[in-house]
Amino acid sequence: MDDLNEAVNATNSTFTQSAVTYMEATSTNLDTFTAHNGKIIFFHGESDPVFSMYDTVSYYENLSSRDGSNTGTFARLFLIPGMNHCSGGSYALDSFDPLGAIVSWVEAGTAPDSMIARNSFNPTANPLNPTPNPLSGSALPSGRSRPLCPYPQYAQYTGTGSSEDAANFTCVAPNPDDELAPKVKTIFHRQ
């Protein structure tokens, strides 16, 4: 790890700033972005071994602290259960369409209240990706789907219908009186 740390932080006469300089996005001032009607969807795999999802949650919470209830008009965060860095994970439901969601938000003004995620281990589950990562969702039943809910909401089974079908789940906000809310229940709630 020390060698990796040294390499990532390296500089020289040509490259006077390290790559880390650009990785630490801490400014929550998105005023210029929002002034141009910018919209952003953050998503992060809960099993990401490279970057902690807690850093992304922290950034989003800081953004929400700065912009208050206005945050949801331009930014949404979705945590993806079981997903590694950008995709994959044997328990991942990593087949979803954030591009379609952002296009709909920008062009039609429809903010994503949820996105449907599927087990991409089943090649027919995602027509946009006919050759899925062979390990993605391999430990899950074929065809499983769930709604991805905007943070801090989480998907809760309605109690009727198949627990493998996203249609039988609803996005709910954590109860603020619940001592596990919002982070732990939001992040680790599983059906």
Question: Which functions belong to the PLM regions below?
Answer:
Residues 1-191:
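C-terminal His-loop and adjacent cap/lid subdomain of alpha/beta-hydrolase
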